[in-house]
Amino acid sequence: YDKKVDSIILFGVNG
């Protein structure tokens, strides 16, 4: 998937 989506997931996990 797009890197932007990955960033959203990482931010979501990291808070």
Swiss-Prot record:
Its main location: secreted. One of its GO terms (cellular component) is extracellular region. It is found in: Secreted, Cell wall. Keywords: Cell wall, Secreted. This is 43 kDa cell wall protein.
